[in-house]
Amino acid sequence: MRISKPHLRSISIQCYLCLLLKSHFLTEAGIHVFILGCFSAGLPKTEANWVNVISDLKKIEDLIQSMHIDATLYTESDVHPSCKVTAMKCFLLELQVISHESGDTDIHDTVENLIILANNILSSNGNITESGCKECEELEEKNIKEFLQSFVHIVQMFINTS
């Protein structure tokens, strides 16, 4: 399975820029530019990753159109901004149900990619603890279409606050 990591492309571009400027590394200012360039190459590009998560959700939605999956999933339809990480973790757990219920390798691969992308973004934000949020099992059960719509909504909340 190939995991798409578009943020690595920006790192290679920054490395090429460093090579173009290599003649200036002999000065103190050039060394500072080089060090700052290396730091910026490692910074997460969360907005781009969330866009890729939405893209994977759309792909899953397209793939399940041709199947009949009669599953209900725990869905947070009214996410409070202070509980968005907890809600995202519930959505990621429920995605595994879609993967299992479908039995389709394309859906499975897309779900795995989406989970990896989302977990990488969440881990780059540090361990955020939220209190007063609903547990996954306390959420309302909804069909897959409503689940995916709510999932896109919460991802957009992450994009708007990054």
UniProtKB/Swiss-Prot annotation:
Belongs to the IL-15/IL-21 family. Residues 30-48 form a propeptide. One of its GO terms (cellular component) is extracellular space. This is Interleukin-15. The keyword Aminoacyl-tRNA synthetase does not apply. Pfam families: IL15. Keywords: Cytokine, Disulfide bond, Glycoprotein, Secreted, Signal. It is found in: Secreted. Glycans are attached at N127. Residues 1-29 form the signal peptide. One of its GO terms (biological process) is interleukin-15-mediated signaling pathway. Disulfide bonds join C83-C133, C90-C136. Cytokine that plays a major role in the development of inflammatory and protective immune responses to microbial invaders and parasites by modulating immune cells of both the innate and adaptive immune systems. Stimulates the proliferation of natural killer cells, T-cells and B-cells and promotes the secretion of several cytokines. In monocytes, induces the production of IL8 and monocyte chemotactic protein 1/CCL2, two chemokines that attract neutrophils and monocytes respectively to sites of infection. One of its GO terms (molecular function) is cytokine activity.
